[in-house]
């Protein structure tokens, strides 16, 4: 956005500054454990939620699908928020959903307790394509047992969550925010578990 490239091509946004990098959000792809979907290739012909319209999740999902060769003709997509997507998956109304968020995401954990789930890993080819296409993507491993019933680690990509502030904010206000972030770092880490 700052340089007007990528998704912001031609739309330079320079009225803000980064205050701090917060945490890494994992691109999580959730399916029912009783499904026949074990890899991204298995999503062909399936009905999936790629996140709310114009969200970071939607952007990540589209880029992951493109890197896998799954065009909009090969998958049927919906723009559900996480709660809608989890409900739709639980009710067999969709086959998978994307969720870009910190791990231990509450909506995924609640779903896992209600209906067994599986998270899909990205293969090495997909990971390399994504990381070559954008410096914002990093290799990320979701540890085994992050969610109920998830007994294997999951290989995916992550994106850094960054706190931005308008350049109109006073330096004093930015200093107060920054100080609060670092003085309450442990509290914030604990609260992220419940996202």
Where are these regions (language model features)?
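Extracellular/periplasmic catalytic domains that process cell-envelope and extracellular macromolecules
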Residues: 10-12, 21-23, 42, 112, ...
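Conserved small/polar residues in nucleotide/adenosyl-binding loops
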Residues: 193-195
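Second-shell loop/turn segments in exported
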Residues: 16, 47-53, 162-168
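Bilobed "Venus flytrap"/periplasmic-binding protein-like clamshell domains
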Residues: 21-91
């Amino acid at each position: 956005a700052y340089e007007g490239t990528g998704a912001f091509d031609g739309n330079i946004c320079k009225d803000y500054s980064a205050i701090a990098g917060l945490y890494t959000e994992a691109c999580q792809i959730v399916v029912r454990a009783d499904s026949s979907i074990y890899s991204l290739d298995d999503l062909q012909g399936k009905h999936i939620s790629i996140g709310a319209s114009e969200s970071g999740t939607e952007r990540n999902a589209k880029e992951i699908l493109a890197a896998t060769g799954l065009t909009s003709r090969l998958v049927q997509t919906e723009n559900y928020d996480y709660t809608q997507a989890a409900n739709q998956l639980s009710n067999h109304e969709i086959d998978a959903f994307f969720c870009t968020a910190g791990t231990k995401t509450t909506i995924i954990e609640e779903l896992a307790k209600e209906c067994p789930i599986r998270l899909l890993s990205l293969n090495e080819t997909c990971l390399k394509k994504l990381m070559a296409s954008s410096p914002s993507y990093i290799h990320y491993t979701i540890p085994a047992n992050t969610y109920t019933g998830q007994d294997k680690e999951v290989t995916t990509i992550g994106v850094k969550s960054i706190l931005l502030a308008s350049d109109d904010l006073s330096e004093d206000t930015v200093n107060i925010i920054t100080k609060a972030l670092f003085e309450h770092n442990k509290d914030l880490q604990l609260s992220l578990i419940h996202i």
